[in-house]
Amino acid sequence: MGHAMNAGTSPIANMGRLAGKQILVLNWRDIKHSQAGGAEQYMHQISARWVEAGAKVTWFTGHQPGQSAEDFLDGIRILRSGGTLGVYAQAARKLLQTGSLYDAVVDCQNGIPFFSPAFLPRRIPVVQLIHHVHQEQFRSRFSAPMAAVGRFLENTGAKAVYGQRAIAAVSPSTRLELRKLGFRGPVHVVPNGTIEVPQTVGPRDPEPTIAVVSRLVRHKRMDLLLGQLAVAARSIPRLRLEVMGDGPERARLQQLATDLGLDDTVTFHGYQPNAQRNALLSRAWVTASTSAAEGWGCSVIEAAAWGVPCMALRVPGIRDSVVEGRTGWLVDTAREFGPALVTALETMANPNKAREISAQCQQWARCFTWDRSAELLAGVVLEEELRLQGAEEAASSDMATLIRFPAPVAADLSSVVRPTDEIAENNGEVSLLMKGKDEFEAFALLKRVGVLNVQLRPAGRSMLLAGPGSAFAAEAG
């Protein structure tokens, strides 16, 4: 029997195979926590889809004053115990008492791991979910002794406890940082989803406008953006910056804007509900990022959904989210940022060029759906389960290969594709993204099942992120 395929990008259908399974998610916060952010939203969106597919998902997370000890959100059971650090000890107790009742554990690491394999039977699949590596943040935010402890736990301690257990990273940049730390097990890329791409956008503001959605915290380096905005404002009359978001840096940044003579240029809106935020984004010419590093540029992709390109520094996470020359522009140093911002705004002043770039931004954003993210992470869980059962070897490398061949497929592909692979059929052609395989390994597997008329190429960063069914990624590589 041939392998079933749907038009467009799809992982090998995985969520249905989680039906009936008890899955435990360990996270230090849930989405109702006052400091919840993108990491919590990521796992919540995926968990809700797993529940819809028939899985039974329980979160064990930290407790904040005013929160109940147990809750149900979107079909997800939430258990809360312990504070910011106490949650780790409480999670260990929970795993020792009831861990054997679960079919799989997703261990969300936010700098400090839960070390769940130490408290679970070996047979239970554990997938560590990592958004970004915190080694530099430990150095910059904590005293030397505390920073040393944090770096040890995230690096040496985690490698010792998790060993060859699977990791899901949200971007190629995060995977690269993990490899630099010496993690040698399989690291799968599972990008974030984003908002639904609107059918129509605009009209754009008649004046050159930059819209930024960001928490106002130190590592976002909004002060750098303000400094470079002062440079750009000399060349761009009536330039505007709309800042949406709040945080401990707000008062300092407002004073800096005053000191730079930008009071008439910059508006700090604070936190904005979705409707107001979207209205401001849809009118923007560009968005901007001067962050030191990210796991993934969530706000960059949200802006792209509204057809807004990004001017950014080439840093981890952001360089994955911006396709240079198509959905934005990247520079290597802060000194280059101001002049490049001027060039970007001048480009967007051309209506024809602006329409072209806006269309490419939206095409890129359409690649990132929460349904696909949920399928991909389910695939990582299933692949780890097969590995522990001895039915499948771990991915041997971080390489990925795109294979194209004519449809329909007479061969049974089920013996050669893995749960983490993706397959699509469009216009009489099958596109298969095989992960952990180079071109020679991929061809050998397909030859084994009689698929010989193939075209193979290494899959680049954009292809890996967007999936094989995306014409955008096929062109971008």
PLM segments and residue spans:
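Membrane-proximal helix-turn-helix segments that form the acceptor-binding/catalytic region
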Residues: 134, 146-167
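Conserved acidic donor-binding segment of nucleotide-sugar-dependent glycosyltransferases
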Residues: 324-325, 329-335, 344-349
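Carbohydrate-associated surface elements
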Residues: 173, 193
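Short acidic/histidine- and often glycine-rich active-site loop of Leloir-type glycosyltransferases
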Residues: 137, 315-325, 329-330
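Conserved donor-binding/catalytic core segment of Leloir-type glycosyltransferases
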Residues: 168, 194, 201-229, 242
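Nucleotide-activated donor-binding/catalytic signature segment of Leloir-type glycosyltransferases, i.e.
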Residues: 254-272
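Aromatic "clamp/platform" in nucleotide-sugar-dependent glycosyltransferases that forms part
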Residues: 292
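Short hydrophobic beta-strand element within catalytic cores of glycosyltransferases
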Residues: 300, 309-312
